[in-house]
Amino acid sequence: MRKTFLFIAMAALLATACNSGGKNAAESAADGSQAFVNITDVVPDVILEVRYFGTYNFVGARIDGYLQPTALLTRQAADSLKAVSDDLKAQGYRLKIYDAYRPQRGVDHFVRWGKELDDTLMKRYFYPNEVKDSLFIKDYIAEHSGHSRGSTLDLTLFDMRTEKEVDMGGTFDWFGSESHPDWAATPRPVATGPTTPSPPRSLPTARCCAK
């Protein structure tokens, strides 16, 4: 039920926000104009874990274009996110964000990594049941991303009562069927994280994902 609520709430957010930008939004982010805002300026109590600024992601390296551990959105999307956040806080939850605006340089980095089939540094953590050259075919990686418009974000819910993230069926950037919005079966433990050890945060940079 919680997963369904989040999906509906964020679908409403994106339906509202996508009317505001298109390609111009990405260009505005690049030139530093006011079309984009820092999410924490609008939703100050949001939790940020910008995975692509660090090395614990499916590539295993900081992603090109991620110069700071910040998250940007178009103003309209951020205002809509604030409304969602306020509703969730009343129910005892906070938003935790992994990614928002994604520069095209970052998308290009994913594509290059996807073509380097020998680089499987993070396979056991993010795609243990997938062959790497299937990631394009299954649409886990693409040459263009809705994130680059600045009105898309990746997030989860943080339960303020338990001080834990809500189980969404799979970890962030899990390349598997458990990540699909219509997944209804009981997820395998490996997809949810608790039985899968995390690698050290100081991983060596991969040679160099997601839509």
What do the PLM-derived regions correspond to, one by one?
Residues 1-4:
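Positively charged n-region of N-terminal signal peptides that target proteins for export
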Residues 6-11:
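Sec-dependent N-terminal signal peptides
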Residues 19-100, 107-209:
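Extracytoplasmic cell-surface/polysaccharide-interacting catalytic and binding patches
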Residues 14-17:
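C-terminal motif of bacterial Sec signal peptides marking the signal peptidase cleavage site
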